[in-house]
């Protein structure tokens, strides 16, 4: 009986890891759609989002079934409660990639981004995808040290976001209010994507150690 239970726990981790992978792919494609004004790629992200939503619902259901039927304690209870929190975080990652793709679609055939911020978003997108891929890995490995590294890499995203904001506030900005609003919202989408990847890593650390990092700050509270 317990063997079957732990197999179900492993299957749940695999589902969560797969969801992280799909969210990372979605953000990578959404970024390319944004940078290249690629309508077909944006549409693909929008269409494929249903895969993440479906897997999210199934993973959440699996976690609640385990919680209700198995009455887990200690480490197993931590694993299931953390999994429920991860489902929500990964689901939001997918939704944020969807927002990026929808922005690219809405402005097509024009480019959303002024040329001077393209480089920022290429790098912001790269970091976001790297964080998503890192979350995918640690969900399976449950390695708290690697999970801590994801939290450290999020500093790069924060720094890029600060630089982007300074560009928007510069008196030399000449692209108007609408472009500034688009850039601000898009920057926020990427920042929140990273925050949710960090939340996944934070939950992995809790799963493995029974406590949150000593320097812990809940993502999004900064």
Swiss-Prot record:
Keywords: Cytoplasm, Phosphate transport, Transport. The keyword Cytoplasm applies. GO terms for molecular function: protein homodimerization activity. Its main location: cytoplasm. Gene3D superfamilies: Phosphate transport system protein phou homolog 2, domain 2. InterPro entries: P_transport_PhoU (IPR028366), PhoU-like_sf (IPR038078), PhoU_dom (IPR026022). Plays a role in the regulation of phosphate uptake. Belongs to the PhoU family. NCBIfam families: phoU_full. This is Phosphate-specific transport system accessory protein PhoU homolog 1. It comes from Mycobacterium leprae (strain TN).
